[in-house]
Design a protein with these regions (language model features):
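General structural feature for long, well-ordered alpha-helical segments within catalytic domains
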Residues: 7, 28-35, 43-46, 65-69, ...
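Active-site mouth loops of central-metabolism enzymes
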Residues: 14-34, 86-102, 118-124
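Catalytic domains of carbohydrate-active enzymes, especially glycoside hydrolases
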Residues: 31-53, 108-116
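Hydrophobic faces of well-ordered beta-strands that scaffold small-molecule active sites
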Residues: 10-15, 47-49, 80-87, 115-118
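Conserved small/polar residues in nucleotide/adenosyl-binding loops
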Residues: 128-132
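N-terminal amphipathic alpha-helix/helix-capping segment at the start of soluble metabolic enzymes
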Residues: 1-23, 70, 75
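Glycine-rich, proline-tolerant flexible connector loops at the mouths of alpha/beta enzymes
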Residues: 23, 45-70, 88-94, 120-127
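N-terminal active-site wall of soluble small-molecule enzyme domains
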Residues: 61-72, 76-86, 92-112
Length: 134
């Protein structure tokens, strides 16, 4: 019996995690835009470019609209899926939100360009996993 070979799918995190870890999420949207075309040609399955601390840092420190950032990234990545890191019931914040708020935020994230949502929840709530099918 032949073993089915599945392709390796690579997800790149440089536009979210690299500057989050190295320079406290201070990379502006304008600094990201020049490399998008080259990244889009690499053949990544997805680029994780939103979520985690990017939303807060965009507003609080960079004085940017995080939704506009997402739309600009979506416009630039023609062939690559966009992924976000989502804090479960906390969305992208630091406290839990009501289920309807979480659902609305997920809907708006998808409407603005997100294809894949990677969920991490600090206490691994079963309810978050069950509700993640929004």
């Amino acid at each position: 019996m032949a073993v089915e070979k599945k392709p390796v799918k690579i997800m790149e995190t440089v536009l979210r995690d690299a500057h989050q870890s190295l320079i406290a999420t201070r990379m502006t949207t304008e600094q990201m835009l020049p490399i998008i075309d080259k990244m889009d040609k690499v053949g990544y399955h997805a680029v994780e470019c939103w979520g985690g601390a990017t939303f807060d840092a965009s507003l609080r420190f960079l004085h940017e609209d995080p939704w506009m950032r997402l739309r600009k990234l979506r416009d630039g990545f023609k062939n690559t899926k966009l992924q976000m890191l989502f804090r479960g019931q906390n969305i992208l914040g630091y406290r839990p939100y009501a289920d309807d708020v979480v659902e609305y935020f997920v809907q708006k994230s998808i409407a603005n360009g997100i294809d894949i949502i990677s969920i991490f929840d600090c206490i691994d709530r079963k309810s978050t996993r069950l509700n993640s099918s929004h």
